Amino acid sequence: MINTSHRSQSTFQPSVARGASPQETVTNKVDLFDPAQPPDPLRQAFDGITNAGGVAKAQLLQENQSAWNARWKLVEGAKDSITAQYFCWDHDALGMALLGHMFKKARNEEVQIRLMVDSTGDTFGTRGFKSHIGGKDYLQEVVMTGNAEAKVYHPHWKKVIDQALAIGSTAISANNHDKILEVDGNRGITGGRNIGYEYFVHPDDFKGAWRDQDIYFEGKETAHALRRAFDVEYGAPWITQKVRGDLLGNWVQRDLELLGAYKMMDLWLKDKPLSMEEKQHLRSSEDGRKGEARHLMDRALAALPDEGLERAASRRERKSLLKLAEELVGYTELRGSYNATAPDMHDAEVKIIDKTSSVGIGTDELNSTLWNLAGAAQKSIYIENPYVVLSEDMIQGLRQAGERGVQIVLGTNSPASTDSAVTQAFFLRDWPRLSATIPNLTILCASGNRKLHAKTAVIDEQATLVTTYNLDFISQHTNSEVGSVTWSKEFAKETVDGFNQDQADPLNGVVEYKILRDEQGKPIRRDGLPVLDEKGDLVNEPEVLFGPANHLTPDMLSQYQKKVHRWDFLRKILPQLNPVDTFRKH
């Protein structure tokens, strides 16, 4: 997100591409090592990511409907295998449909499937598939096809034991935050999106729809690297719990509901798009939605014999499907979106960077790669991240880049758009210090209806990161995280274009947080006290020109101040709480 109204020189625009085209970069690397040319530090840092991917086709998934259809088509085209891991996998209309799609692939086509969900992503077991309170029966139905396996990552009872065995550790907050969908060893998707309606519906259908970002790729080396990131956590029996069928079979059959949810979604995506009048009717008329939902459900049930399911739906099953259908028909922009123009596909190199959780085997390729790439930046670093509580090493890394003259733009949430009160409380406390001590830093915050959830960065208009990684302690030290690094000027440009579109979108309400500076850009105060010492360290609080107090209510500011005091007190008496963040949808 870019805001040019406050400081025009901070606008992040890609320069004219220099040197090889993305295609030449992929197919002919000789020019990269020409001794007559000075070495490119960023390319050297990228080449230092070993055994993690290679030549691929890459597609940036910015729009929510495109991201959903990419997943639908990926599963639809699976011939041999599917691996999937999501921090959150809700049993709403979208989550049930995707699980039903995989059930169909396992049951009817004998595609081998492995699924994993995180226990904290479904904290109380009511919204996902980890427990019988929620939807474990459906996960069991998939497993009982004989062609699927499923696991729950770090169940709460294991968390309690691990924490008791290691007092003061981060075991209580060690989650699998990965978002992985990989098919047939040659295609995959990763990025910020979980499986739930907020991530895939249009803002016209739900004002609070998330703004997120994923990458779809085609390439064997990259797909195998993403699968390895799945395997390293899936294959750890001391952290995971296998999902098994009930002792005497699944006592309540869920096959018809799963296939019905799949078929309703498939029909809805492939139907003729709705006219504007039809959309408005469904959005405004409850009777209209109920009528459309019954029609959609009846069409799906009539098609189930073609999927090998001949029996009639029971009253319970019809009630369950009708509820899903009534939700689905409210997402009017999804209707007919299957055949919409897809985002551009780019020739690129795509590498996967992985990190296991703090109770895993200790693999961490992600943090070191992030620092190496940031350390190699010569011109610009653009970051979009929803939760910003920077550690000291993160701050120092960005500070060193800024001191080299690198322009740094950080886009994140404000309290008006966030879902994480805890991280925002600390960001509100920290941002003036970041602005004062990191040279060439611009801080832009969303303050509108949409929640920013993208976890991306573009470095020197060439290397693009699309990850699951939040800029906080949890992601850095405790969670399992995964991400991609894409080498392509075209892919980087498209990402930057998306940032600029975010700035212009009134739903985001982007504002720039600023401190008082002199004409040379040095932080100053009106009372004459210095802000920084000779080393560039903070000695007095900066003076805020525009910040939270300029766009938040006094009540909201007071609530956040209380949160900071409360957490600072708790962290003093309970050091193990230092990494604990909100257990909302990250």
Where would I find each of the regions flagged by the language model?
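Non-Sec secretion/translocation targeting segments of pathogen effectors
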Residues: 1-27
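Sec/Tat-exported extracytoplasmic proteins
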Residues: 79, 86, 109, 146, ...
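C-terminal low-complexity, acidic/polar tails when present
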Residues: 273, 277, 282, 296-301, ...
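N-terminal carbohydrate-binding accessory modules
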Residues: 22-45
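Long, C-terminal catalytic modules of enzymes
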Residues: 244, 445-586
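HKD-type phospholipase D/PLD-like phosphodiesterase module
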Residues: 39-41, 46-81, 88-375, 413-462, ...
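Long, well-ordered mid-to-C-terminal structural blocks that present hydrophobic/aromatic surfaces
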Residues: 370-372, 376-418
